[in-house]
Structure formats: C-alpha cells, structure tokens
C-alpha cells in the first residue's frame, strides 16, 4: 500500500511544499488540507492556532490512515508542533525559515515572513544560532500571503504594490529567506522588484528530504496513478478556480471539511 501523506496549511501556499515532496516521493497518496476559514494564520492568537490545527488534523487522521503529517506553514509550525506531537502517534514535520543555509552563502540576508513569524522568539533563536555574524533584516507582510493566494486563482500580482512592500530592501540584501510557504509562488515577481541576482531560499527541498527519511521505503506500484484528496475548512467563492489548480496537480475536486466553531479573532 502507498503511504498517506497529509499536508496542512492555512491556504494554498503549502502546495509549494507539496511539489517538493511529490518530486522526491511520487508514489504516495497525498491529502492536502487548508484552513481557509482561519486564513491568514499570521493574525491569529497562539491558542486559536493550536485549537484549529489540532481539530482539523485529528479529524483527517481519523478519516484517512495518515502515515505522516506535514505542517506546511511557518507561522503554525512555530506554535503547534509540540501539541500535535503529543496528540498523534505518527511523525509530524514542520517548516522553519531557512536561516542556516542562507547564512552559509550571504551576510546580507532578508527574512520575508508573516508578521507573526518575525516576532516569535523561535525566529530570533534561529538567527542567533546560525546567522549571528550576518546582517539579517526582517520584513513581515500579510498582504504578500494574500497576493500569493490571489495569483494561484488567476489574479495577476500588482507589481506597484509589491514594490511598495519591498522597496526598503533594494540594494540592502543579496539573499532572501522565503519564510512563508506562500512566497515561492512569488519568486518571479520578487526578482523583478529586487533584481535577478538576489538569491531566494526556501525550506521545501529540506522538508521533502526529511519526510522521505521518516517514511522509509514507499511500497507502491510504479504503474499506479494516485489522485490526491483536498479539503478546505469552509466553502469558498474561488472553488472553480481552485479545482482547476488542484486538478492540474492530480487532486480530486475540493471537499469542505467544516469547522464547528466560529472564528473569533
């Protein structure tokens, strides 16, 4: 039987991680879930983050025989991993900003993340541990997350707006850590604003290697074509556009998981 891999994010940015994992583990069954009712996670309290992610992930683990959970959200990963690892008996992998590899190639680093991620002590500990001699500039933006989501459903990125967000970094950084899984979908536009020579680094490939290591051998026939399942936490007006995106990635049509509690921000 193929392995069942659950990938979770607040939105569809986690598809950047899915693509890296599928490249290394093509013969697996993928379940992708996103909490669109709670989006964006960078604006939620830690208690609400833990409550929402725990409920949704446990529900899907009961529905599918999940072998490993990937929290494809930097904001959630800095908060929910200890709780999930207590609740579940299977491996739970999170994503963290790729500060360490960035520090190996540059001393003028920019960390681009959500407002929540750049404020967390975990992020400052990473910088202290792996980039203490580097000049690390921090920029947190919820709007960039929204722009990535919009791009994925066919809305062009507004380069004037993007330039306004990133302009303080022009000529100041030569390596940018994409500290949110949504941001790899904005690679082209970020380079248009900051220059083609700026190096962009994310955690996707490293996460994929870790998942492959934890899963071990994947028992599936090469001739098998496995369609993935995708869930959202609430109905969405973008369902048609999202289904087109997911179909191109070999997922079945979007299903609404439902979340019983209203979101109190």
UniProtKB/Swiss-Prot annotation:
Pfam families per UniProt: Asp_Glu_race
GO annotation, biological process: cell wall organization; peptidoglycan biosynthetic process; regulation of cell shape
Reaction equations catalysed: L-glutamate = D-glutamate
Catalytic residue positions: 73 (proton donor/acceptor), 180 (proton donor/acceptor)
EC number(s) per entry: 5.1.1.3
Keywords: Cell shape, Cell wall biogenesis/degradation, Isomerase, Peptidoglycan synthesis
Pathway where it operates: Cell wall biogenesis; peptidoglycan biosynthesis
InterPro entries named among the record's database cross-references: Asp/Glu/hydantoin_racemase, Asp/Glu_race, Asp/Glu_racemase_AS_1, Asp/Glu_racemase_AS_2, Glu_race
Residues reported to bind substrate: 9-10, 41-42, 74-75, 181-182
Record-level Gene Ontology MF annotations: glutamate racemase activity
Gene3D superfamilies (UniProt xref): 3.40.50.1860
Functional note: Provides the (R)-glutamate required for cell wall biosynthesis.
Family to which the UniProt record says this protein belongs: Belongs to the aspartate/glutamate racemases family.
Classification via NCBIfam families: glut_race
Protein name, entry field: Glutamate racemase
Organism: Aliivibrio salmonicida (strain LFI1238) (Vibrio salmonicida (strain LFI1238))
């Amino acid at each position: 039987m193929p392995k069942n891999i659950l990938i979770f994010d607040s939105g569809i940015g986690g598809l950047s991680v899915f693509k890296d994992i599928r490249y290394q583990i093509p013969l697996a069954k993928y379940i992708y879930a996103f909490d669109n009712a709670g989006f964006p996670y960078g604006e939620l309290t830690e208690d609400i983050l833990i409550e929402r992610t725990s409920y949704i992930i446990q529900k899907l683990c009961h529905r599918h025989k999940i072998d490993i959970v990937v929290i494809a959200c930097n904001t959630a990963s800095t908060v929910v991993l200890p709780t999930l690892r207590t609740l579940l008996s299977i491996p739970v992998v999170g994503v963290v900003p790729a500060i360490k590899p960035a520090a190996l190639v540059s001393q003028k680093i920019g960390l681009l993340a959500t407002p929540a991620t750049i404020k967390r002590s975990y992020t400052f500990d990473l910088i202290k541990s792996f980039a203490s001699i580097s000049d690390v500039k921090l920029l947190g933006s919820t709007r960039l997350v929204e722009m990535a989501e919009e791009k994925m459903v066919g809305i062009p990125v507004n380069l004037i707006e993007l330039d306004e967000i990133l302009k303080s970094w022009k000529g100041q950084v030569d390596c940018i850590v994409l500290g949110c899984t949504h941001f790899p979908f904005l690679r082209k536009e970020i380079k248009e604003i900051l220059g083609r020579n700026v190096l962009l680094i994310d955690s996707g490939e490293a996460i994929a290697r870790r998942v492959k290591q934890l899963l071990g051998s994947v028992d599936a026939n090469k001739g098998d074509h496995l369609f993935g399942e995708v869930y959202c936490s609430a109905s969405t007006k973008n369902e048609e556009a999202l289904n087109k995106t997911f179909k191109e990635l070999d997922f079945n049509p979007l299903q609404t998981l439902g979340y019983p509690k209203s979101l109190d921000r």
